[in-house]
Amino acid sequence: ILDQGEPKYLNSPETPLFSKGNTLYGLFEARQAIRAKEYVLVCEGYMDVVALAQLGFPNAVATLGTACTANHVRMLLRQTDKVVFSFDGDSAGQRAAQRALEACLPLMSDDKEIRFLFLPTEHDPDSYVRAYGAAAFEKAIQEAMSISSFFFKVASEGHDLTTPEGRAHTHHAAKPLLLSMPPIALRTQMLRELAIRTNTTPAELEAFCGLTIVPAPQVTYQTKVLKPQSGANAQTV
């Protein structure tokens, strides 16, 4: 906020020529670096992108004052198989991360990796790198929370999993997220892990969510006894 009480940055409105939901700041310039580093770092603000490019992270992009959309995710996954979202650790950052999770889950596939990095509340990416160094920031990126771990965090937030009510509330929160996903192996694994965490069987949880888990194929062997023909002995197959 400036001295006059005005915001430092003003978000421009959507127009037919400028759609924030279809635009990522710095993506064109970052394409080569994204391929070289094999991941893209998505920041909350375009000034983070400018600063990070100067500090050794030219593979950073940013949304333009709007929540992450499905179109943003499609654009990112066309460039790389690994996406890392960086958010502030405050409540606003948590809300933005949850919206990104909701945008990502319907577009997940088993060959893609999406992670969520939450910085301390007193830092943004620029200040974190300046305080702890580029190596520490890179380490934090590589150790960022997986999309499945963040899913469990969102679904169980504020719920006591030691109580039936808490487990039921967690199932209620998880259901629309699981239903939004395509029928991939990751969804099956997430559902089974959620069943373990909530003391539920996978069959009970999939019935609640209206999902079908394909069971592993079982191979059976049968023994057939052939009737002996004239002059022949019984044969067993």
Feature roles, as predicted:
Residues 31-40, 67-83, 87-237:
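A charged alpha-helical hairpin associated with nucleic-acid processing machineries
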